[in-house]
């Protein structure tokens, strides 16, 4: 019994262990990264990735997978760099429409029982096409209020760390500690039981897809505030990054088993790995390989621990 509890705790702590394993060599090679300025520079792009990861987590909660979150974040950035600057009301309306479209897709997937991978793969091309129509070439500019918000400096601790912690705490409380969060997770954990209790799976899935849309919008706007311009291909890699971060954080594709805190730690771990390799002037191709290697190692450890539990 005690051994099983220890195994479970070790498995739950894998996201934190992964973060420490990546952080230690960074600190040893570049001690300045622990300073206020260094940590801010190292985690400069963490907030958009964390928000995109939570968007993916909302979809994985109901046993689905979103292959369109990267193009969606890029589209939001393009809307922010064009419509939101020239005609703020139209830009806000377009962003609201994007969120409603996400919710409608969730309802459609449940109503027609269509595989989410097929729908979101098609949706990825739709988002990319709209982004290219809005911004055929890189350009545009960030609205002043977004740039100001993303440039805000918190005292003592670098802003990306503060925002990531706040996002993790608020997300954990809402999804794991509220009755609404339990019901929503139940749609992925035990949908038959939810039907017997009279809860609408269509509504639950539409709600989670809508939440994913909100996080996607926040991710795109925060990324625009950091880059100050947009591009239709700005965040394409966020699709795989977000999936990897959720899985790295302890999430599973079935059963509604997700961890908000773990997903945030996973996103930060992948961001650190990418930033560290950039500091070493290593090609971006190797950065993707490094992130994949981290994911494989953590998943292998998780499988070993699960086998230990069964034995």
Model-derived features: positions:
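Single transmembrane alpha-helix segments in multi-pass membrane proteins
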Residues: 21-86, 109-112, 245-260, 293
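Transmembrane helix-bundle core of multi-pass membrane transporters
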Residues: 112, 116-177, 204-207, 226-235, ...
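Helix-loop-helix "hairpin" substructures at the membrane interface of multi-pass membrane proteins
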Residues: 94, 100-105, 109, 156-230
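Hydrophobic alpha-helical transmembrane segments
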Residues: 13-17, 42, 50, 71-75, ...
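Alpha-helical transmembrane segments within multi-pass membrane transporters and channels
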Residues: 87-124, 266
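Transmembrane alpha-helical segments in multi-pass inner-membrane proteins
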Residues: 216, 226-292
